[in-house]
């Protein structure tokens, strides 16, 4: 008998849980006239290990069989499957992107102002003869304004001469308004006024044509706090939220994104587009960005405390992102019992939406 056969026979003989058929088969497979070699342990350690192995083998019992599957309604897991206790819903997070760049920080204003002064030091001197014909109205107007700027061609860098002996001192002092946006706009508007008429005569201050000023960054809606208008918070993203009135089951009125149940014959993006039209009307030019959800919210089902019966189904809501390009929301004749709507910024959503609801969707919000 080979070494491998003797080892296999040794292991089988030590296992008492082996059936008699396998034991007899092992004995029959042994060649006639060949007796099993006596056990030889080459060290005391090997002998102790074999004894411990044999003891552990004899005391090992087989695991019990799997318990039968029951249909009892006593536990939540056995009550229903996930598809029976949850409703699949689709929602749309309709956004209006920022229309203006954000306000600069004081550090950024100082940095850009420093770059303007540095540029005046490094560039070639301004050649007015190339732009203004001598003794014309434009040339006279340029001379008047250049004198008011103390000989500095640039209009928005303050009293700074990049060619003088103090050209190295190109940083503004702390607290100075020279680098502020408001100060620069005032200087540029004042310089844009024409001081000389076509006849070469200086125009009095009361007869000068005022330059049209740019629109303010804060609109009338910002001043009044009107959260239903789209022309507010122009430097931030706005999100459409709607308020659903309290239902008969005792659920309180709450703010949320337009949401509805997904039927079996629609995809998530199709349901989102339909729900938006049914909730906020069709007087909006909107666009659903892609067919993949950008956020996910789960509402747990409600079970009875005594018998574990399902009292209220849960919800799994998948949100898709949308853009509005024109129009306005209109809740008239909506099909989802909505009573109000708002266009809110990310900071305003935090205080309006429920905490868990906001936590589920905050990952898709834009930076501003």
Swiss-Prot record:
Pfam families: MRP-L46 (PF11788), NUDIX (PF00293)
Subcellular location: Mitochondrion
Keyword Heme in annotation: no
Biased composition (Low complexity): 69-81
Span list, region Disordered: 53-81
Keyword Transit peptide on entry: yes
Keyword annotations from UniProtKB, A to Z: Mitochondrion, Ribonucleoprotein, Ribosomal protein, Transit peptide
One GO CC term, this protein: mitochondrial large ribosomal subunit
Molecular function GO labels: structural constituent of ribosome
Function field: Component of the mitochondrial ribosome (mitoribosome), a dedicated translation machinery responsible for the synthesis of mitochondrial genome-encoded proteins, including at least some of the essential transmembrane subunits of the mitochondrial respiratory chain. The mitoribosomes are attached to the mitochondrial inner membrane and translation products are cotranslationally integrated into the membrane.
Subunit (UniProt): Component of the mitochondrial large ribosomal subunit (mt-LSU). Mature N.crassa 74S mitochondrial ribosomes consist of a small (37S) and a large (54S) subunit. The 37S small subunit contains a 16S ribosomal RNA (16S mt-rRNA) and 32 different proteins. The 54S large subunit contains a 23S rRNA (23S mt-rRNA) and 42 different proteins.
Family: Belongs to the mitochondrion-specific ribosomal protein mL46 family.
Identification of the protein by name: Large ribosomal subunit protein mL46
Source species of the chain: Neurospora crassa (strain ATCC 24698 / 74-OR23-1A / CBS 708.71 / DSM 1257 / FGSC 987)
Native organism taxonomy: Eukaryota, Fungi, Dikarya, Ascomycota, Pezizomycotina
Gene name, Swiss-Prot/TrEMBL: mrpl17
């Amino acid at each position: 008998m080979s070494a491998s056969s003797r080892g296999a026979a040794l292991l089988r003989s030590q296992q008492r849980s082996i059936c008699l058929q396998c034991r007899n088969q092992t004995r029959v497979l042994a060649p006639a006239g060949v007796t099993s070699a006596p056990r030889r342990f080459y060290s005391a350690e090997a002998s102790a290990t074999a004894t411990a192995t044999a003891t552990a083998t004899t005391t090992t019992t087989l695991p019990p069989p799997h318990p039968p599957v029951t249909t009892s309604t006593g536990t939540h897991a056995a009550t229903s499957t996930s598809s029976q206790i949850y409703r699949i819903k689709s929602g749309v997070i309709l956004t209006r992107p920022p229309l203006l760049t954000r306000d600069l920080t004081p550090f950024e204003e100082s940095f850009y102002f420093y770059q303007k002064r540095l540029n005046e030091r490094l560039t070639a001197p301004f050649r007015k003869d190339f732009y203004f014909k001598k003794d014309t109205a434009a040339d006279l107007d340029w001379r008047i304004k250049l004198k008011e700027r103390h000989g500095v061609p640039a209009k928005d860098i303050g009293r700074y001469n990049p060619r003088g002996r103090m050209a190295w001192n190109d940083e503004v002092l702390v607290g100075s308004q020279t680098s502020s946006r408001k100060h620069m706009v005032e200087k540029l508007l004042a310089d844009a006024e024409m001081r000389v008429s076509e006849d070469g005569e200086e125009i009095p201050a009361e007869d000068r044509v005022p330059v049209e000023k740019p629109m303010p960054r804060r609109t009338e809606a910002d001043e009044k706090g009107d959260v239903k208008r789209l022309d507010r918070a122009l430097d931030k993203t706005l999100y459409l939220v709607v308020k659903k009135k309290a239902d008969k089951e005792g659920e309180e009125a709450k703010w949320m994104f337009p949401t509805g149940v997904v039927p079996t014959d629609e995809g998530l993006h199709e349901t989102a587009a339909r729900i938006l039209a049914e909730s906020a009307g069709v007087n909006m030019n909107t666009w659903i960005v892609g067919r993949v959800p950008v956020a996910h919210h789960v509402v747990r089902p409600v079970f009875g405390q005594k018998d574990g019966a399902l009292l209220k189904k849960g919800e799994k809501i998948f949100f898709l992102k949308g853009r509005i390009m024109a129009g306005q929301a209109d809740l008239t004749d909506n099909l989802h019992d909505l009573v109000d709507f708002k266009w809110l910024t990310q900071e305003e959503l935090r205080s309006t939406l429920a905490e868990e609801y906001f936590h589920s969707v905050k990952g898709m919000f834009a930076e501003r």
